[in-house]
Structure formats: C-alpha cells, structure tokens
A protein has these predicted regions:
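Activation targets extended, charge/polar-rich intrinsically disordered C-terminal tails
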Residues: 16, 21-54, 58, 181-248
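Short hydrophobic transmembrane-like helices used for membrane targeting/insertion
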Residues: 1, 11-20
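Second-shell loop/turn segments in exported
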Residues: 158-168, 206-212
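Cysteine-centered motifs
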Residues: 4-6
Length: 248
C-alpha cells in the first residue's frame, strides 16, 4: 500500500482546516488592499481633475501678424490639430518624408494630427473592434504612443464644432516644433508605422511620449495649445476641458 508523503497527510484534519482558513483570510486581505489602492487611485485622479479643471492658461497677447490658421477638431472623445500641408511655415510632405503618401489624393489640402495609444490605434479602427483587453490596457497601463496623421480637407468639417485659431509665424513655428518632437526619429527619419488596418489617407508614426491616463490624446492637444501660446487648460484628459475654454 502506498501512502501520501505530503505535509497535510501528517496533520490532523482540524489543523488543516485552520490553516486553510488562515490562507483564505490572508488572500482576502491582500485582495482588499488591492481594491483599496485601486479606488484610491481613481479617487485621486478625479480629485486632481476637479481641482485643475476650472483653471485656464490665458492666451498670450502679441502684436505680431496672425497669418496662420490652426483648427482644433473633436473626434468623438478625441481631438486633432488640423494644419495645411503646404504653408509658408512648413511643407509637411518634405518635413516628414511623406510626399509619395500624399499623392493618394492631391485635392486634400490639410493634415489632421492626433496622438494616442499605439495599440488602441492599431487594434481599434472602429469602436466595434474594441476589446475589453485593449480597453483595460489603455485605461490602466503606460503604453507606447503613436501620432496619427490623416489626409483631409476643411470643407468636410462641421464648423459648428471646431475651434479656429490664428497664429503668428513665431507661434506657428513653436507648434510645428512641438508636433515634430512628438514623433520618434531614427537616423533623421521619422519612425513610420506601415502595418496598420486604415486607408491610404492615414499615416502613423511612433510617438516620443508614452500614453497613459495622465497624458491622453487631449492632453497632447492641450500641450500644443500651450506651446503655441493659445488659451489652454492645466490638465485636460477629456476634450470638453479644451472646448469649454473657447465657449462664448
């Protein structure tokens, strides 16, 4: 006859039960601590949000000629910065080495620049593609960022939902510098992501900053406004915090 050589076989049953209860109690205690930290983190996030949300960074006044138009566009919960492809300030085709990509439709005159979670961009072309795993990683992780560039035209925009800005040469150059620095570069070339499920009108680049709930797509747009000396918020994880600054 074979006997079990395990530890519990030599311990009375009531002792085994007590040890199991102790293990369960320790496990529940650890789970409770995790949940407490989780809810404390969420509470802290919204406390900081409500503290900073009302404050506005005012537009810096200037006597310079305001010759460049910049448009902020809402895209669902997301925001983009719309700029002309060609201007006296920059030729984006040459600057990002995408002249061939832009030949897909020469009637389109502008580019939409947006920042976001790289995995979310590439895995979620449509909201129907969103999975719980992708959503969880986006909300609770610190993930690689990406810059989405979309070929488009202002004539297709709903003008009732946009913010139109006028920038000087100096302010425009600061915004351009910000956008270019938001892209990761290797050997003087932007790191373009060629394997994506979008159309020929869409381009993606690796971003120089990681994405998290502390630095979202709307935080990126808001930083662009700050850099170019426009009215902005202190922290804007949600698009409403940007657009509320421009309500009449």
């Amino acid at each position: 006859m074979q006997y079990c050589n395990c530890r519990f076989s030599r311990i009375p049953i009531f002792v085994q039960i007590q040890e199991m209860k102790l293990l369960v109690k320790k496990l529940l205690l650890r789970v409770g601590i995790v949940f407490e930290l989780f809810f404390a983190l969420i509470a802290s996030y919204f406390i900081i949000f409500f503290v900073l949300a009302p404050f506005t960074i005012d537009k810096r006044t200037t006597t310079e000629t305001l010759r460049h138009e910049v448009i902020i566009i809402p895209e669902g919960i997301h925001t983009d910065i719309l700029l002309p492809i060609h201007s006296t300030a920059i030729d984006w085709g040459k600057a990002l080495f995408i002249e061939k990509d832009l030949q897909v439709d020469t009637f389109q005159t502008h580019l939409k620049f947006g920042y976001g979670d790289k995995n979310f961009f590439l895995q979620t072309k449509n909201w129907s593609d969103l999975t719980s795993k992708t959503l969880f990683r986006t909300i609770f992780g610190i993930n690689e960022g990406a810059i989405h560039v979309n070929l488009c035209s202002p004539r297709d925009l709903d003008t009732s939902k946009i913010i139109k800005l006028k920038l000087s040469d100096r302010q425009m150059n600061k915004l351009i510098h910000f956008i270019k620095n938001s892209i990761k570069w290797s050997n003087n070339f932007p790191e373009q992501i060629t394997n994506h499920p979008y159309s020929q009108y869409d381009l993606f680049f690796n971003a120089s900053k990681d994405y998290s709930v502390a630095y979202t797509c709307n935080c990126w747009t808001n930083e662009g406004l700050q850099v170019s000396e426009q009215k902005a918020g202190y922290w804007t994880p949600f698009k409403e915090l940007i657009f509320s600054k421009y309500e009449p």
